[in-house]
Amino acid sequence: MAKKSMIAKNNRPAKFAVQEYTRCQRCGRPHSVYRKFKLCRICLRELAHAGQIPGMRKASW
């Protein structure tokens, strides 16, 4: 889990555009965040398995 201070820092607008970085909207994790969903890989996997992301299904080939 991210510290509350880092989540609050991420929620306010950055002074310059280059200072913005992606952070998971659900848990606040800063690494491996998918831009399309704004979720980290762990939260994305949990929501996909629960069927809460429409159109996403487990790959099999």
From Swiss-Prot:
Single biological process term from Gene Ontology: translation
Keyword entries, A-Z: Metal-binding, Ribonucleoprotein, Ribosomal protein, RNA-binding, rRNA-binding, Zinc
Single Gene Ontology MF annotation: zinc ion binding
Gene designation per UniProt: rpsZ
Function field: Binds 16S rRNA, required for the assembly of 30S particles and may also be responsible for determining the conformation of the 16S rRNA at the A site.
Protein name: Small ribosomal subunit protein uS14B
Binding site for Zn(2+): 24, 27, 40, 43
Highest taxon, organism lineage: Bacteria
Reported cofactor(s): Zn(2+)
Organism lineage string: Bacteria, Bacillati, Bacillota, Bacilli, Lactobacillales
Subunit text: Part of the 30S ribosomal subunit. Contacts proteins S3 and S10.
Cofactor note: Binds 1 zinc ion per subunit.
